[in-house]
């Protein structure tokens, strides 16, 4: 969430910056609520001071042998008024907090202005798409012919947007995840973590999935008097980042760099009719996630390095890709700046997103109270958090199958994956 003090003191400027990402902040309503908050705060403090002053006079009256009943009645009346004002203030603060939780992050000044994905800006390309001398097939046809992708069985068992992988295709899927983890932990300095696949509401609030995107989640257990509800993770970003919730990290221990390979679960509530064929958009998919916790002054450089770590996976797999910076109107809710990496898919004759790398600055940290303490500082300060896919395993599998296909329908195994597949050079 945004800094409440900044919202109060820079309301008009905040509204202007939010408008660039298509979010209309109700300035008039917020101004009125803020005036009411000030009024209630002042009234509460005045009533508290009056009650304290009169309460002190009770002892003095008793010492003089005076009747304290009128004073006691006055104190009681002030107490009732104070309780009423406190309740009004608490309800108002709850309203203000709910509004603050619904406001997206401010775009960084370096983010290009734009309304939607058509105004994203390409920043670089790597590799040249292969020219095939035969008609290319998509991953669905190739995978089904090889007996490695079974969509029909998945539909029978669960429903649409699920997959059963078998044989060497399943092995390649596993090999990709292992390769990514080994790369990030041995060459990029990340610590591997094994995390829960179920998280509570406080964790989802911390990383920004709640309250706005509840319909995108798979909820497994509703909230009760005994505890919070539980939901399946949409990304390992949620448990990895929440490790820092309500903690103070020593400056000497920064940056914190974590990675995890997990299944991810998304309802794809707003994606009806999109990418209905194949593995591109599934309810359950594997992903290797990258998370960094850094000092504020280091976060933009960290975004560049994190994006580079994700790109390295594609470079080692020799898959052509391009990197774009998202414009203000296409960024995610909690992001201040995002780079999307798009891999070349021959069957679609286009680049498709395979990773999204974002700097959240202190947006998540404020929600989670994730802080660090510098030696020279008197008080802890909020961390900056970053996250990105390194990579989405299923989409990487799609890219490998399509880019490494042969005319006879077989798939050449990329050299970097062969050690993970017992030296296998070809599937089929």
From Swiss-Prot:
Which residues make up the binding site for ATP?
266-268, 353-356
Q: Which organism is it from?
A: Shewanella sediminis (strain HAW-EB3)
Pfam families associated with the record: Seryl_tRNA_N, tRNA-synt_2b
Provide the assembly information. Answer: Homodimer. The tRNA molecule binds across the dimer.
Q: Which UniProt keywords apply?
A: Aminoacyl-tRNA synthetase, ATP-binding, Cytoplasm, Ligase, Nucleotide-binding, Protein biosynthesis
Name its pathway. Answer: Aminoacyl-tRNA biosynthesis; selenocysteinyl-tRNA(Sec) biosynthesis; L-seryl-tRNA(Sec) from L-serine and tRNA(Sec): step 1/1
Please name the gene that encodes this protein.
Answer: serS
Q: What's this protein's name?
A: Serine--tRNA ligase
The catalysed reaction is: tRNA(Ser) + L-serine + ATP = L-seryl-tRNA(Ser) + AMP + diphosphate + H(+); tRNA(Sec) + L-serine + ATP = L-seryl-tRNA(Sec) + AMP + diphosphate + H(+)
Annotated domain remarks: Consists of two distinct domains, a catalytic core and a N-terminal extension that is involved in tRNA binding.
């Amino acid at each position: 969430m945004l800094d409440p003090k900044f919202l109060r003191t820079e309301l008009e400027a905040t509204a202007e910056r939010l408008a660039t990402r298509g979010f209309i902040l109700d300035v008039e309503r917020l101004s009125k609520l803020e005036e009411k908050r000030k009024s209630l705060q002042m009234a509460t403090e005045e009533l508290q001071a009056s009650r304290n002053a009169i309460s002190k006079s009770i002892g003095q009256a008793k010492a003089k042998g005076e009747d304290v009943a009128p004073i006691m009645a006055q104190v009681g009346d002030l107490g009732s008024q104070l309780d009423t004002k406190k309740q009004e203030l608490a309800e108002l603060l709850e309203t203000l907090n709910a509004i603050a939780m619904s406001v997206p992050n401010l775009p960084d000044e370096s983010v290009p202005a734009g309304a939607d994905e058509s105004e994203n800006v390409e920043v670089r390309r790597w590799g040249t798409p292969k020219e095939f001398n035969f008609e290319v097939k998509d991953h669905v046809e190739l995978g089904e012919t090889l007996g490695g992708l079974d969509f029909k069985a998945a539909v029978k068992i669960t429903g649409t947007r699920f997959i059963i992988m078998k044989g060497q295709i399943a092995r390649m899927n596993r090999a990709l995840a292992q390769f990514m983890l080994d790369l990030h932990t041995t060459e990029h300095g990340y610590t591997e973590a094994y995390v829960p696949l179920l998280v509570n509401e406080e964790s989802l609030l911390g990383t920004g999935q709640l309250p706005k995107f509840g319909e995108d989640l798979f909820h497994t257990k509703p909230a009760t008097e005994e505890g919070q509800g539980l939901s399946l993770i949409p990304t390992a970003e949620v448990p990895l980042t929440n490790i820092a919730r309500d903690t103070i990290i020593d400056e000497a221990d920064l940056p914190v760099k974590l990675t995890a390979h997990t299944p991810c679960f998304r309802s794809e509530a707003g994606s009806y009719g999109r990418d209905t064929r194949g593995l591109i958009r599934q309810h359950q998919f594997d992903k290797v996630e990258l998370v960094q916790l850094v000092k504020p002054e280091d976060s933009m450089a960290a975004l560049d390095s994190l994006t580079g770590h994700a790109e390295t996976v594609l470079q080692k797999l020799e898959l052509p890709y391009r990197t774009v910076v998202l414009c203000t109107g296409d960024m995610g809710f909690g992001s201040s700046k995002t780079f999307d990496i798009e891999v070349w898919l021959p069957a679609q004759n286009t680049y498709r997103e395979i990773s999204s790398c974002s700097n959240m600055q202190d947006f998540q940290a404020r929600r989670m109270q994730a802080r660090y303490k510098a030696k020279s500082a008197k008080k802890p300060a909020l961390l900056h958090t970053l996250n990105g896919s390194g990579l989405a395993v299923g989409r990487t599998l799609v890219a490998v199958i399509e880019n490494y296909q042969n005319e006879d329908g077989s798939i050449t195994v990329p050299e970097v994956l062969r050690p993970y597949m017992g030296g296998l050079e070809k599937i089929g």
